[in-house]
Structure formats: structure tokens, C-alpha cells
Amino acid sequence: PILVISQLFFGIIAGVFASVLLYMFKVNFYQESYIEIIFLISLILMILKPKYVCFAYSGAILGSVSIVYNLMINANLIDKGNDLFYIPIGNLLILVGVIHFIEGLLVAIDGSRGSIPVFTRINGEIRGGFAFNRVWIMPMSLVLFQSVEDPFSSIPISHVPAWILATGALAGFEIFYGAVGYKSVTFTKSKTSKVLISGSLISSYGIIMILLGV
């Protein structure tokens, strides 16, 4: 129970932190773009194979679908319709980067909790180590736009940032649930050093993704 509670607690805190960062980076998507699919994909991957609970995979899948969809539109193979699968790749990179940055922090802070001793035979010698298996559910909010012809909005103007008003669209926040996980094993490092190194690498990858998307 304590392990589950800690996963829920750190997951909620991480989700709030991620939402703040996404808002600061002005990450937004059109409501018709189905950006929420990235969270659904991560949950499906978690069910199929926990080691693939990674938004890099989910983002790559959704980004590929968006690119193929737009190529088909440009080739006049399908009608554009609304903003279906119109996903700004820069915003998608920042979204994936922020989630990875937060994931790295989670791994460094909470990744060693619940680790179990394991043993293996290497070159005829029995060695002991630790196995890690953690999954955090992160509730996150995203700014979603919906193009409107009606100039009147129920959202108080004083509560809407200028960068949202400049789009000429109706904006709203929606909550999504994503899963990030950490599954690894070590026979050469201590529990603390293993999660710190892994967390640093994951966060560094996230920072690179953010810089590419900015």
C-alpha cells in the first residue's frame, strides 16, 4: 500500500509540475487534433509491455500519423476537413520533452523505492543486484483551442493570457492522464547511484527534446 500511495502522490505532484511547464512554454493544440491519443497510446503500451511506457514511443507514433495524414492531404488523397491530426511538431516535441524531464526527476527521487534484490551468474560467479519497477500516473492539463466564428466567449477576458487571445480561438483546459514508468536492473551500482544516473539521462533527453521544439 505504501508503494502505491507514493506512486500516486509523486505522480500527482509531477503532473502539476508538468502542467505548469507546458503552460510556461505556451504549448497548445487544437481540440480536433486528437492530441489526447498520445496519452491513450502510453496506457495501451503500458498494458501490452510495461517497458514501452515511454512518451517517446507514443509521440513518435502520433507524430508519424500526423505527418502521413498531412502528406495525404497535400497529395489530395483525402479532404482536409477540420483540424484532425493537425499537430504542431514543435509543440509535440516540447510536450514529450517536458514529460521526459519530469520522468527523470521521478526516477531520481522515487525510482529506488520498492526495489528487490536479484541474483545472477556472470562468468561462473554469482552476483547480487537490484531490480526496479515503478509506474507513475500523471494527471496533466493542456490548453486546447477550438476555432469559433462567434466572437463572444464565456471565458472572462481578464483571465485569458494575451498569447491565447491572439489566436482568435476559444481556449480551454482539459485534464489528461498519462503513465510513465521505470523498469531496470543493476548488478554493478548501488540503488541510489543507479536511479540518479538513469534519472539524469532521462531528464537530459527531455531537455534536448524541449530545445528542439522551442
Model-derived regions, located:
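Hydrophobic transmembrane alpha-helices and their immediate loop junctions
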Residues: 1-214
